[in-house]
A protein has these predicted regions:
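RNA-binding accessory domains that recognize and position tRNA/RNA substrates
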Residues: 1-144, 152-159
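Catalytic cores of secreted/periplasmic lytic hydrolases that degrade extracellular macromolecules
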Residues: 148
Length: 159
């Protein structure tokens, strides 16, 4: 995983070209998850699941670069508790009843376009190098496919 920062303009991520040794692996958070955790008791948002509203790193929820909430506890039969993050003055980091805006995925992709092209080219080159090293030992080249998001990306790269 490469380093990233949060883009307040798009609500998305901006990739950098510095490899990161330990990755936090942010994941997108959609309205369905927000509803389950009770975000609708603090903020308003449209009930759409086409674009994420924010990102989560472990149990922390980040909206446009600010950690606004975290979850604690929870289990198979109990709902986790949502804790709204407050600043040093005791005020919520994101004002109560503020409307959440979805991540602008198109603009985020445009801003990361050159970095994504470099990553794609490097990955295709590595795949090709492995193929060339093994092509005399094999009569066909298989790529594992689980159907997950990583497999879908890999399938696109090896076409």
């Amino acid at each position: 995983m490469y380093q990233y920062s949060y883009d307040r303009e798009t609500g998305g991520l901006l990739l950098s070209d510095d490899p990161q040794l330990i990755s936090k692996e942010p994941r997108p958070v959609y309205a369905y998850e927000l509803d389950l955790l009770g975000f609708n008791e603090h903020w308003s948002y449209k009930s759409q699941n086409d674009a994420p509203y924010m990102w989560a790193e472990s149990n922390s929820y980040i909206y446009r670069g600010k950690k606004i909430a975290q979850v604690k506890g929870g289990g198979l039969y109990e709902k986790p508790a949502l804790e709204v993050v407050k600043d040093e003055f005791g005020d919520q980091v994101l004002a109560e009843d503020e409307e959440l805006v979805p991540v602008d995925l198109k603009r985020m992709s445009e801003k990361n376009g050159s970095m994504l092209q470099v990553l794609e080219q490097m990955t295709v080159k590595k795949i090709y190098e492995v193929y060339k090293r093994r092509e005399k030992q094999l009569d066909c080249f298989h790529v594992a496919f689980s159907g997950g998001k990583d497999s879908v990306v890999l399938l696109d790269l090896v076409k």
